[in-house]
């Protein structure tokens, strides 16, 4: 018994020294910079103390070699990897692929040993050149969407060869080994067509399971984006469309629980109801809900856009069977996640001994704290606390952007922030939040810690005080 207590004590001590047993892996998207006004997000807006790993999405591929995609990726890479100067424990990875990237470049690249070698060599050079700690393979999906059946095995071959090359390079360079991870499917048919789970799991450091987009307007009826459990009336393959089933499918088919990372969406899916009075789960729909003013994509709202909808008079419902909320207003219906559902899922994750949480994406959280009245990064912070991620020795940013110098009534046009502190003093005695600008309906004041920032709505929109949001006039 004394031995057992000693071993337990050592384990607890070791865990205290190493930090949390769980990982919090946060994606950043390089197109978030193009969102208007308060939605614009760059690496400098990331709080480096929240996540254990940050993943930059996405890189591309040309002639079987990894490449940049955006005109300013190299500049953003530096800002992204400089976050490690403020958190010495932070690891950064670069993701390649994504849904819009398709499958063809991956299929060509894995098809021959020479092509794979070309790719792996380019990846090592690229990651070391720009200061990343690993590569995240986001092939959606091997063996599906035009990818031939043999790609299931060739994906395993690629990952095995990459892991071996990374190990060899670490020895030769006397540097820590580069990590190799993958974002993988949550749909059972895509999993079966795409992954040799036991073999693949040997070589991947983490397996990021995309346990979201499980329902959407493509089905013709309402459904939750990322339900923890099935809805009671779901049968057949529909009963597989939940986080619990998907994660256990990966585990039961040969992936170690500690390598499996549960996907958490910081966004929701919107629908148009055919009949506004039929507004529960499974209600008939006629298509995507309207695009949000910042993310500008039909059927999709960032968490901060969701808060605007909720504050505009939507009815919120907690779906106890699936442990997630939904909301509706007139003919608009929303399936989403909130602080409560993130907390419930985090406890479930720990009870099942999974390796941690992955979020898509940190730029979709209420990163300014202006929309939800829950502080900055409320969803990501919920997971950080629930998983016991240590922030010791980490320096968080003070404010998300520079204060504005324009005094009220000067009618400044253009961007969403700029200049230095001083100027208006509008926020000196105001609570944190958003306020209208007296003579400019397109503009609004953002108050943070008594400091004044002037922001602008997207062209054509006006600041609406009924929802504290940018809206159509």
UniProtKB/Swiss-Prot annotation:
Reported tissue expression: Detected in macrophages and lung epithelial cells. Detected in the acinar cells of parotid gland and von Ebner's gland but not in submandibular and sublingual glands. Detected in gastric chief cells. Also present in parotid glandular saliva and gastric juice (at protein level). Highly expressed in submandibular gland and stomach. Highly expressed in parotid gland but not in submandibular and sublingual glands. In tongue, expressed only in von Ebner's gland. Expressed at lower levels in lung.
EC category name: hydrolase
Active site per the UniProt annotation: 140
Region called Disordered, residue ranges: 394-421
Subcellular location(s) of the protein: Secreted; Cytoplasm; Cytoplasmic granule
Induction description: Up-regulated upon pulmonary inflammation elicited by sensitization and aerosol challenge with the aeroallergen ovalbumin. Up-regulated during T-helper cell type 2 (Th2) inflammation. Induction is mediated by IL-13.
Binding site for chitin: 70-71, 97-100, 141, 210-213, 360
Chemical reaction(s) catalysed: Random endo-hydrolysis of N-acetyl-beta-D-glucosaminide (1->4)-beta-linkages in chitin and chitodextrins
Keyword ATP-binding: no
Keyword Cytoplasm attached: yes
Residue ranges of every copy of the GH18 domain listed in the record: 22-390
UniProt signal peptide: 1-21
PANTHER family, per database record: ACIDIC MAMMALIAN CHITINASE, CHITINASE
Protein's name according to its UniProt entry: Acidic mammalian chitinase
């Amino acid at each position: 018994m004394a031995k057992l207590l000693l071993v337990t004590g050592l384990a607890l001590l070791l865990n205290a020294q190493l930090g949390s047993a769980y990982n919090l892996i946060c994606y950043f998207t390089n197109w978030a910079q193009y969102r208007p006004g308060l939605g614009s997000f760059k690496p400098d807006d990331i709080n480096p103390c929240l996540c254990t790993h940050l993943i930059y999405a996405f890189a591309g591929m040309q002639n079987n070699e990894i490449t940049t995609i955006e005109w300013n990726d190299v500049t953003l890479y530096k800002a992204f990897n400089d976050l490690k100067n403020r958190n010495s424990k932070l690891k950064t990875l670069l993701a390649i692929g994504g849904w819009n990237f398709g499958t063809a470049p991956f299929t060509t690249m894995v098809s021959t040993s020479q092509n794979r070698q070309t790719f792996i060599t380019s990846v090592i050079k690229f990651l070391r050149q720009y200061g990343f700690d690993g590569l995240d393979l986001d092939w959606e999906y091997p063996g599906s969407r035009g990818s031939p059946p043999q790609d299931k095995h060739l994906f395993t071959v690629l990952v095995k060869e990459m892991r071996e090359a990374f190990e060899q390079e670490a020895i030769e360079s006397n540097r820590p080994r580069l990590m190799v991870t993958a974002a993988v499917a949550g749909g059972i048919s895509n999993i079966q067509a795409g992954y040799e789970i036991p073999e693949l799991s040997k070589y991947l450091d983490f397996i990021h399971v995309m346990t979201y987009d499980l329902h959407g307007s493509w089905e013709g009826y309402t459904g939750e984006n990322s339900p923890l459990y099935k809805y009671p009336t779901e049968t057949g393959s529909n009963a597989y469309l939940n986080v619990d089933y998907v994660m256990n499918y990966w585990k039961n088919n040969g992936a170690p629980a500690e390598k499996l990372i549960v996907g958490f969406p910081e966004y929701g899916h919107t629908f148009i109801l055919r009949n506004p009075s039929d507004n529960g789960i499974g209600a008939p729909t006629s298509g995507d809900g309207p695009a949000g003013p910042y993310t500008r994509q039909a059927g999709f709202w960032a968490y901060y856009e969701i808060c605007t909808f909720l504050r505009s008079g939507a009815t919120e419902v907690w779906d106890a069977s699936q442990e997630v909320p939904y909301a509706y207003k007139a003919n608009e219906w929303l399936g989403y996640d909130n602080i409560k559902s993130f907390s419930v899922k985090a406890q479930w994750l720990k009870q099942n001994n999974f390796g941690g949480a992955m979020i898509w994406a940190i730029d979709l959280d209420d990163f300014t704290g202006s929309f939800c009245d829950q502080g900055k990064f409320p969803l990501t912070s919920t997971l950080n606390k629930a998983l016991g991620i240590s922030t010791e020795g980490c320096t968080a940013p003070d404010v998300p952007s520079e204060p504005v110098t324009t005094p009220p009534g000067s009618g400044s046009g253009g961007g969403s922030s700029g200049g230095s502190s001083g100027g208006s003093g509008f926020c000196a005695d105001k609570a944190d939040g958003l306020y209208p600008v007296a003579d400019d309906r397109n503009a609004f004041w953002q108050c943070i810690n008594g400091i004044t920032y002037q922001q602008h709505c997207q062209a054509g929109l006006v600041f609406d005080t009924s929802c504290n949001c940018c809206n159509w006039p």
